[in-house]
Amino acid sequence: EEIFGPVLVIIPYKDEEDAIRIANDSQYGLSGFVVSKDLERARRVARRIRTGQVRVNGAKHDFSAPFGGYKYSGNGREFGVFGIEEYLEAKSICGYFPA
């Protein structure tokens, strides 16, 4: 089952590749968190984690950014442009010219 709540899991890893493998070894993917003294490394790892959102070094939630999960954590997005688009229907009208 997917856990909804703050959970801190500490698992030892050998190297960056192993850490990413462990993080992605789940059928769920709602949110993740990366902490590192090396900001470029943290960003590189964050790009490879398969979750709908990854926070780096304590970043707060940005309500202008889309929020939603990967894998069994659902589809669709809330917030941001992607969240608004979930409620819109696109329509194309061809041949509409002024008389």
Named regions from a protein language model:
Residues 1-99:
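Conserved C-terminal structural/oligomerization subdomain of aldehyde/semialdehyde dehydrogenase
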